[in-house]
Amino acid sequence: AASLGFSSVIVDDGWQTEDNQRGYAFCGDWEPSKVKFPDFPGHVKRVQEMGLKYIMWFSVPYIGKKSRIWESFQDKLLYYDGFQQAGVLDLRYPEVREYLKRIYKRAVNEWKIDGLKLDFIDEFYLRKESPFFEEGMDCADIQEALNRLLTETMTELTAIRPDCMIEFRQRYIGPQIRKYGNLLRVSDCPGAGISNRIGTVDLRLLSGETAVHSDMLMWHKEERAEEAALQIESSLFSTVQISVDLSTLTERMRKLLIFWITFMKEKAKLLQESQLQPAEPENLYPEVAADNEGERLLVHYSGKRAVDLRQIPKQMTYIHGTKAEEVIFRTPKG
């Protein structure tokens, strides 16, 4: 991955268990599987020595019925989800918040990971079966308790590691979420380049200087490189996450990834830091541009759109992010 230009690896659900069934029955202990990772700190170190940062997924709310810690917290739940075989922890209990913070601090302190992907925080809300304020709680409002957890987590993790990355995804993203993390990702949309485009542009417009990531791009190993390129082009104004088996890449796909990753790094200031100029949100942003210090980058995501060359800066890059075979240019007279 590092040789292709990637800088980080995100380890998703599954590192904590050998079980491959749906649900979260084994969440809660947050111990790396000894079968998969006999020496987890050593594994993290080896990955980092390859030049990659290491980010781990954690499901914040779920505590599984098959976890060892279940007995300690089964009476401190907002509700139990039979389908997921897991309960949603009630953050109004201070010992619940402290337990979660210890887990995250241990991951940074002992395992030396570079960041955390904190998932499913939108599950923290009251249901009909949720308890009212009870003895032992120090917050009446679950949202206030969540605010305490996330604020303290950010403060304590960055005290250990100032550059610690904390990711949240789009379904529960708003301006306030920026104080809890520093990496905002588009909500799940596998194989949907248009959804990734809408999500990344929306987040860029709302997230200030906070880093915006695409949802993971994926494709079949026999997919045409041109189809994969369209997915990447749809997420150009974000940090692109790729989820494919790199060992199965064809040479053409490998060259494709190297080209676009190199391009995005070379144009990082223009793509990531410039003020976006997206057009026609009612049409799903078919045109997006960015300008910076005499340079302009324009992407068209639908056909029959004109590239205006009558007033251009010193340098202009045009990207044809559509299957349309024609490109229309408007040039100065003469």
Task: Tell me what each language-model feature is.
Residues 14, 121, 240:
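Flexible loop residues that form catalytic
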Residues 15-43, 67-94, 123-147, 153:
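Aromatic- and acidic-residue-enriched carbohydrate-binding clefts of CAZyme catalytic domains
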Residues 35-42, 50, 95, 99-102, ...:
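Generic recognition of stable, solvent-exposed alpha-helical segments in well-folded globular domains
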